[in-house]
Amino acid sequence: MYIKVLSVTDINNYIKNTMDNDFILNNASIRGEISNFKIHSSGHVYFSMKDQWSKINCVMFRSAAKGLKFLPEDGMKIIANGRISAYVKDGSYQLYCDKLELEGLGELYIAFEKLKNKLEKEGLFKEECKKSLPQYAKKIGVITSETGAAIRDIINVATRRNKNCEILIYPSLVQGTNASSDIIKGIKELNKVKDLDVIILARGGGSIEELWVFNDEELAREIFKSKVPIITGVGHETDFTIADFVSDKRAPTPSAAAEIAIKDLQELNSRLENYKNALNYYVLNNLKEKYNKLDRLKLSMEGNSPERIIINEYNKIDFIINKLNSYIKIEVDKRKEELSRMSILLSSNNPLNILNKGYSVIQDGTGKVINTIKELDKEKKVTINLKDGKKEYQIQ
């Protein structure tokens, strides 16, 4: 038996009043994905929230939308807070939002953008504030984990491009609570090293939480204050951190950072050879022009027999030839001497020269260097590296 016949408006009003007096519906917090997001000319925001099975229409009035800390987009996963009420005219209900929050990593994203905007306004990202990188770095400092893939990648690049380049490694934490202070200390210590050309701050890939240390404000300011130029090679190519924005040069990976810092020795030799060839071409071309000019003079003056003029022209040419030959020899000798001096300097800094002094390097089966007697377990196979070769032994 039905209680009472109601009009459509009456039942819609009843539903609205019921919803407006419901505690849960008046304090709703809903998780879902944004779709059909639109900003009206009035400033009101309209969108839907959906999950795998359902969707709900949402509205956020201009007064509440002004407090948004991010610009919502379709596909974003959010948590919407507000009240659910009915719209009497068409019998629909919707969520009236007071606040929107990004789900999961949203708070980190907001913190990142807030710090980025702050430091950018202070001028820490300006190109004119960035220090120039040395053209030919001979001594490089590296701040990274001593056990991570980043240091292996950097050493491999250094060995391939210029094995005489001196690498100073400052072992540091690169994630976790104390990592930022550890890296800051490393920057300060390496700034004390005499004749240090550049610092590489590196870490392999990881999640946003693992890379979060490189979004630390104190670390960013220390990078900015560094007197030695700093190259960052953090994560993968798609990873960007605050440290990348404030550093003097951002590289997409640790390997790329090493390639920026360490010039290829073969490339330098090739460049020197190109200079030599260009100089030879210039000299030969100049001589050819002089000889052609002389031939023209001889032809034009042949009937008048101006022997003295011709002799003078030949003397001028001989003088030019001698001068150019002398210039070529001086320049080539100078380049050879400079290259020899660089080679001797780089060779003297080669860490492998220590083997020539009677020392040895012991590695386990994986290639890891053994530093303490505790690592020499019985039956363990090791490789002993000496200046004239290496040999495997088994610990008894």
Swiss-Prot record:
Chief site of localization: cytoplasm
| Keywords tagged on the record | Cytoplasm, Exonuclease, Hydrolase, Nuclease
Top-level EC class as recorded in UniProt: hydrolase
- GO cellular component term, pick one: exodeoxyribonuclease VII complex
Q: Which superkingdom, per the lineage?
A: Bacteria
Reply yes or no: does the keyword Ribonucleoprotein apply. Answer: no
Gene Ontology terms describing biological process: DNA catabolic process
Q: Which reaction does it catalyse?
A: Exonucleolytic cleavage in either 5'- to 3'- or 3'- to 5'-direction to yield nucleoside 5'-phosphates
Q: Name one GO molecular function term.
A: nucleic acid binding
Q: Pfam families of this UniProt entry?
A: Exonuc_VII_L, tRNA_anti_2
Q: Which family does it belong to?
A: Belongs to the XseA family.
Role of this protein:
Bidirectionally degrades single-stranded DNA into large acid-insoluble oligonucleotides, which are then degraded further into small acid-soluble oligonucleotides.
Summary of subunit composition and partner proteins: Heterooligomer composed of large and small subunits.
PANTHER family given in the database record? EXODEOXYRIBONUCLEASE 7 LARGE SUBUNIT (PTHR30008:SF0)
Which protein is depicted?
A: Exodeoxyribonuclease 7 large subunit
